[in-house]
């Protein structure tokens, strides 16, 4: 079963996650995964995930993002026989050990941020129309989110400053 912390339309990665799980199920000859969308009820995600574990109906529970780390840790401890996969959730980054029944992987957001910063630095130093002569670049996030502020933001700044240490990054 897959718990989407949001809705499928919120993030293209959610759709890719579901399609990947469906493809894997087809290749393995097992049932298609149940997909549960958490919607906008952020406080209810853990309860939904817990209900999936309590049902003991699924070999594997899958969820996504740093917003689910604490819930995954709690439910993994309550149901040590339940296999859980946490995509793009940083358990180690919050100083916790990954439980034996959890597979956790994190996207290398710092690489994305660094390359984005390099690109912004190259643009601002260029002679392209509207390039900022003041060597100033900006980074805009749609929300404050740990993977973004802990990894992308500092890496973006490092990438921009690798082009020119005088570049100012505005966040």
Model-derived features: where do they sit?
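A residue-level marker of the well-folded mature domains of exported/periplasmic proteins
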Residues: 1-171
């Amino acid at each position: 079963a897959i718990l989407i912390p949001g809705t499928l339309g919120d993030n293209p990665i959610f759709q890719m996650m579901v399609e990947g799980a469906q493809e894997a199920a087809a290749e393995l000859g097992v049932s298609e995964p149940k997909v549960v969308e958490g919607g906008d009820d952020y406080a209810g995600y853990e309860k939904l995930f817990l209900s999936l574990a309590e049902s003991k109906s699924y070999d594997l529970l899958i969820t996504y993002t740093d917003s689910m780390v604490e819930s995954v840790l709690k439910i993994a401890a309550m149901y040590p026989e339940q296999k859980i996969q946490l995509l793009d959730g940083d358990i180690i980054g919050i100083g916790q050990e990954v439980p034996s029944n959890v597979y956790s992987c994190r996207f290398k957001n710092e690489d994305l941020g660094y390359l984005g910063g390099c690109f912004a630095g190259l643009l601002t130093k260029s002679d392209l129309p509207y390039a900022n002569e003041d060597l100033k670049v900006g980074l805009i996030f749609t929300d404050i989110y740990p993977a973004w502020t802990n990894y992308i933001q500092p890496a973006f700044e490092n990438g921009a400053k690798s082009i020119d240490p005088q570049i100012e990054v505005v966040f």
